[in-house]
């Protein structure tokens, strides 16, 4: 199979140079080419560890919205992300986690879930709705069982932590 090629200013860790990248599903070769100029920059994809949505879609809006958000990020340079919830009712959060779980295997850029709330300090909500909860072991076990939870935002000073 013939490799695809792209050329431009390659930015990789601590160096940058004009070159050409050959790839199929994975990078096969990176070759430096001297005395060339390009307005195209080739950089590693971005990883978003706190993503509530994108392209007009929110992570709590259901499967179709999550798929659209995922595609939006892939098309705009975010190669992987943690779909992030916001503080909501148990039912809505549980439903969102089920949706994430069913889509993670289909969408290569969904690495898992960042559960933001509901275990945050009710006196320090920021933009979160006033739907905080005191965590219980059963609740946390149910959440972890339901989806590939990678990160949980919580307030260590609240009761139950």
Which residues does each predicted region cover?
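Divalent metal-dependent hydrolysis catalytic cores, especially in the metallo-beta-lactamase
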Residues: 52, 67-96, 108-121, 146-161
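Short secondary-structure boundary/capping elements
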Residues: 61-65, 132-138, 155-160
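Conserved phosphate-binding/catalytic loop of the ribokinase/pfkB sugar-kinase fold
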Residues: 121-146
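Alpha-helical scaffolding segments of alpha/beta enzyme cores, especially the outer helices
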Residues: 68, 95-102, 138-142
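Short, conserved beta-strand segments within well-ordered enzyme catalytic domains
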Residues: 22, 46-48, 58, 82-84, ...
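Short amphipathic alpha-helices and their capping/turn segments at secondary-structure boundaries
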Residues: 31-39, 94-107
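N-terminal metal-binding scaffold of metallo-dependent hydrolase/deaminase domains
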Residues: 1-35
């Amino acid at each position: 199979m013939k490799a695809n090629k792209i050329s431009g200013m390659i930015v990789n860790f601590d160096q940058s140079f004009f070159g050409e990248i050959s790839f199929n599903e994975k990078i096969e070769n990176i070759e430096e080419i001297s005395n060339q100029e390009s307005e195209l920059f080739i950089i590693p994809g971005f990883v978003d560890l706190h993503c509530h949505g994108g392209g007009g879609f929110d992570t709590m809006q259901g499967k179709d919205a999550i798929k659209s958000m995922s595609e939006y990020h892939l098309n705009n340079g975010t190669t992987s992300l943690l779909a992030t919830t916001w503080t909501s009712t148990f039912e809505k959060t549980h439903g969102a986690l089920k949706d994430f779980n069913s889509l993670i295997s289909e969408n290569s850029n969904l690495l898992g879930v960042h559960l933001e709330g509901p275990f945050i300090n009710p006196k320090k909500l920021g933009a979160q709705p006033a739907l905080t909860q005191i965590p219980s072991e059963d609740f946390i076990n149910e959440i972890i069982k339901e989806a590939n939870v990678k990160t949980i935002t919580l307030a260590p000073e609240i009761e139950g932590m």
